[in-house]
């Protein structure tokens, strides 16, 4: 599990356009999360940064923490890399960092399109709202697809995963999963 207090603090700093300070980490979510860790016999931590933060900054006994990085087996994509096309981005739209990522992509896409006029980016994500679909623009090659019925197929056929995630915590599953398919990100 990623540390929610860290993600919340990063989100707040991002939205206020300020640099994250150590004092920003101390909030009600922090207190509940640290209390939960201290009540448990063992907490699994998937991020080396977060493991070090807990031990070094917050003096959590490393004997009640276990670093367990996410990993996965390499998968054989359906399509050879030379046959793949399009940029993709993927993420559930109920998760604020994923919505902010799409907004970042919309800003960046015009510059990418100038360099690669034939390029398209396909945006996948469950729970896409009307405001998400309003960003769809076929002329610009900015295509909102909505929910991916088969993520493996999407990753197997794409050329590059783009994920300018402005804030968050933990390890990004989409980055790890894309690597399993040999998809640069």
Where are these regions (language model features)?
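Acceptor-binding helix/loop patch of EC 2.4 sugar-transfer enzymes
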Residues: 2-27, 82, 92
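Membrane-proximal helix-turn-helix segments that form the acceptor-binding/catalytic region
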Residues: 20-43
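Acidic donor-binding loop of glycosyltransferase active sites
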Residues: 41, 156-170, 181-185
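Short alpha-helical segment that forms part of, or immediately flanks, the ligand-binding pocket
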Residues: 152, 173-181
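Short, flexible loop segments at the rims of nucleotide/cofactor-binding pockets, characterized by
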Residues: 19-26, 141, 162-165
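A conditional alpha-helix N-cap/helix-loop micro-motif detector
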Residues: 25-26, 102, 144, 168
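Conserved catalytic-core segment of nucleotide-activated headgroup transferases in glycan assembly
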Residues: 15, 38-44, 49-157
